[in-house]
Amino acid sequence: MHVKAETVLALLTPAPPSVVGQHVVDLSGDGWTLSSTALNRTVPGHLPSQVHLDLFEAGVIDIMASMILTFVGLRMPIGRIPATRLKAYFESTWLVFDGLDTFATITFCDQHVGSTDNQFRQHHFDVSQILKECKQDPVLRINFGSAPNIANTIAKSPDAEEWPPGVQITNEYPNRWYIRKEQSDFGWDWGPAFAPVGPWKPSYIVQNSHAELYVLNTDIDIYRQGQINYLPPDQSQPWIVNASIDFLGPVPCKPSMSIEIKDAATGSVLSSGLLQNVTVSGKSITGTTTIDGDAPKLWWPSGMGKQNLYNVTITVQNDMKKSLAKVTKRTGFRTIFLNQRNITDDQLAQGIAPGANWHFEINGYEFYAKGSNIIPPDAFWPRVTQARMARLFDAVTAGNQNMLRVWASGAYLHDFIYDLADEKGILLWSEFQFSDALYPVNDAFLENVAAEVVYNVRRVNHHPSLALWAGGNEIESLMLPMARRADPTGYSKYIGEYEKLYISLILPLVYENTRSITYSPSSTTEGYLYVNLSAPVPMAERYSNTTPGSYYGDTDYYNYDTSVSFDYNHYPVGRFANEFGFHSMPSLQTWQQAVDPEDLQFNSSVVVLRNHHYTAGGLFTDNFKNSSKGMGEMTMGVEAYYPIPSKSDSVANFSAWCHATQLFQADLYKSQIQFYRRGSGMPERQLGSLYWQLEDIWQAPTWAGIEYDGRWKVLHYVARDIYQPIIVSPFWNYTTGRLEVYVTSDLWEPAQGTVNLTWVDLSGKSIANNAGTPETVSFTVGALNTTNIYTTNISELSLPDLKDSILILSLSGEGRLPNASSKKAFVHQNHFTPVFPKDLSLKDPKLEVSYSPESRKFTVQATGGVSLYTWLDYPAGAVGYFEANAFVLLPGVPKEVSFVAQEGNVTDDWLQRVTVQSLWDQKVRD
């Protein structure tokens, strides 16, 4: 079952032989056709695109009907071609494909050109001779095969590798691990299984004269002299700029390379001249230069300084000084290092527990990584635009995040996404596309992976936002233990295969193409014992070779037992938290984008089936059993801690339940983030919190903090608040009654200030004698540290009614942001209640909201009582965020809040439809 498309490429009249140069035809745009023998349909096509998108635009399928889309992914390959013009007088003609998803067969002038089997590689084919022999107007055809069908065929082959039953994780389509395609296309617990195919990235026809070079890829590596990937760089050393280009065309005779480095903001020249040590290896030309260590302005992550960027132009010349190729890339000067070295004696003397470090250092400075995990922002990458990603990354920096982990088994991010991260100061922990499976290690598979690794490492290496390369997701922490339990006697085999792929193959390829980036074989590890680059397995992982009382590596934590959600004794103690979370429902407005009105019920079949936690484990369209488990977990979380919605209007009740699941999710993440950040001053010296997950791929219950269209859930607001540089946090052991209050800072210098501790009842009246609690406590908190400012036991406080009490914690301090010239004021507010929200004697806060055109701000005030989880909500028609939300509001203390519009039309009518509610409204019947 194939789809064919074709368009004529008309040849021009040949030009004189003296014509030289280069002709590049961008095949992007309309003019393609998509045809299917399976559906007996031919429709207009586009490039870049994928089959589902063109069929949807032609009205053949409903893109919201996930079961139909799954069928399309299984049954429909695709072919395309745009109309354009070629020139007959060039000596060489190449087809260049930046991304074909995944199994494609290419023909040109009815001649077979080649085939592809890797979504993540760039492919190029020489069609010079085919074009010269073409007797008619040339036609380009690309036929795509069904990835699930081909994966199944590979799995059935006699020489296919096999693993113990129950080890490989199938979400919907099976056998994803046999092929090099986006693994989440086969289904995941936060997204659909559409398995799209098509030319998902741009494609070109390149025609060269006898001398010209076409640049396929560019690797610019900037590092300190003597820097080695797994060791801390010496910040006193000069900078080395290593420039390497991969090209099409004849190998030039005695080539030279020149460089010009300009400040991207001012245009001033930092350095120019010839590169040294120019070498040619295969189809790559490489040269280096040295820059004085203090000459460039450094690039810093968000919150730590400016994002200084430079444009680097590389020119290749032949021995006659004729320019053969020129390429410009924007980059920055910084060092980023993942420190996994053993704890030193000096660190032990500071009170840091023994073991090994696991934290990042930027330009020689330890910092606290605050952020989340980013998944594919759409099931179809051609729909992911620069404007859309700019809005998402604006939300990241507005949320006080400085790092995103680019989760493995989506896709390697486009260059424009790294460009945005460079501009906004967002570090991108990047991973190779392997996740939650064991993978083959046969020669053909490894050869395919090697090309994928080299291409992508070189492609993105110039971006200062690139923070790390990790081998894959949860391979060492989840998959190897699963294999050990399933087949204890064969465990050494699986360890050997893991090391063959992620250490013996990928690690040297990374190190050969960059000296500026650290590599970790897996997202979650205990770190390494030693590195010996001359050994067959160059990195010896620690695995379970740990010592009690010592800490190693990063942590990955999910616990769906809601009875212990807020018991921080259950949270993992480690050096870095790279995954943790709990799912919640999206808002009513988001559900309305994808679900018919009659299905807007918490347990409607449509809503339940869009919940893929837990996944079907196969191609089952009625996964009620597993989906209901995930729905039940959200329900139990709400019922255990929050007022249970019971509204007479079914849609209002559905909306209230959606909001309640978000409250639980946000409070759980807040509890964990506070705990992990406090660890910066504890023996574990914990220096990172990346929660799961940043954003949604569609409208469904997931772990996301930002919904599919960009609307913030409660989580993103709460994370924004608790990711501020200096915070005050309560820690309550509800079993013993012990209450501790900590101030935590991620500044690089000590900070000072005061915390006001104020007990009031839920009508807003002060509790007598402040319940025996000091009203003000002064603090000094060290750099990247935490300090306990108050400890008590609830039983020792003079609280007339625990259910009618709330402690307001208000911090006011002063400190200096990293690389800032002067100190600034910091404020933070938190709260604590000695019972869970469902047990509080809530009062109607009688909330009011108004908008002032003059100040362009909303004013929210409570006149009847304390408003908990004060929630401003906006109608459809625009996307943006409030500068504060989900806050505590005391009666008589109005709060002004701005709205930042990111997309859409904010009209007067729209402004008047902004609403406000609180926890009180969750329990009130309308």
Swiss-Prot record:
Exoglycosidase that cleaves the single beta-linked mannose residue from the non-reducing end of beta-mannosidic oligosaccharides of various complexity and length. Involved in the degradation of polymeric mannan and galactomannan. InterPro entries: Beta-gal/glucu_dom_sf, Beta-mannosidase-like_N2, Beta-mannosidase_GH2, Beta-mannosidase_Ig, Galactose-bd-like_sf, Glyco_hydro_2_Ig-like, Glycoside_hydrolase_SF, Ig-like_fold. GO terms for molecular function: beta-mannosidase activity. Keywords: Carbohydrate metabolism, Glycoprotein, Glycosidase, Hydrolase, Polysaccharide degradation, Secreted, Signal. The active site is at 474 (proton donor). Its EC number is 3.2.1.25. The lineage of its organism: Eukaryota, Fungi, Dikarya, Ascomycota, Pezizomycotina. Homodimer. Glycans are attached at residues 40, 242, 277, 311, 342, 532, 603, 626, 653, 733, 756, 785, 793, 819, 905. This is Beta-mannosidase A. It is found in: Secreted. Its main location: secreted. It comes from Aspergillus fumigatus (strain CBS 144.89 / FGSC A1163 / CEA10) (Neosartorya fumigata). It catalyses: Hydrolysis of terminal, non-reducing beta-D-mannose residues in beta-D-mannosides. GO terms for cellular component: extracellular region. GO terms for biological process: glycoprotein catabolic process; polysaccharide catabolic process. Belongs to the glycosyl hydrolase 2 family. Beta-mannosidase A subfamily. Pathway: Glycan metabolism; N-glycan degradation. Residues 1-21 form the signal peptide.
